[in-house]
Amino acid sequence: MTNRTTLLPEQKEQTRHGGCLFPFQKYITVLSDLCPSVTPHWHDEAELTLIKRGRCTYQIRFETCEAEQGDLLFVPPAALHSLMIPSKSRYESETYVFHMSFLGANTADICAVRYLAPVAAQSLLLPCHIRKGHPAHPELMEIFNSINSVYENAAPGYELILKSLLLRTIAVLLPYGKEESSRPQLQTEHMDKLKLVLEYISEHYAEELSIAQLAKLCFFSEYHFMRFFKKYMG
């Protein structure tokens, strides 16, 4: 059986998702009143998640969705995302985190240039929330279950099968994708600023930080920064 890693929300940024030659890793996330949320974060890899139990509020790229058991979520590379569960509830999910380079996003062929590289760069946006009623849901559930089986058994050549299943995932979502230009420019700028602030806090967490320092990073007044930060971070 392949090793699985339990995802601790506060440690996710430091987690190495698989290895250099096989950048693929499974995580099981469990949330409850003791740990009711995964704080906003991002990483270079994409995610495919199945909610196994409970419901939650997901925020991906500043878009909020209410997800529940049986729903699937696709988080593109470098997308800011977070989730929170209702009080007095329990949430469980299975997530596969993978780098788009594993699928060939860095190669020079038509699949990479037309599809994989744009998805990796977020210039082509695939749907993030695939509800049980979504047309792509049945096929994606079949794919997810196959990924589970192949990953757990880890038979010779299983990496090739996983790669093909992830490519199929992208292919199934492609008809429902849209160009990045459909996203408001202001939202893009806010996302970039928030990622910059979170990265700065992560790098200087041991130091005494002031609102003035963080506001300066965004070229905001302290008042504007406080409103901006509260809006997206709560």
Model-identified regions with their sequence ranges:
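Short, conserved beta-strand element in jelly-roll/cupin
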Residues: 41-58, 74
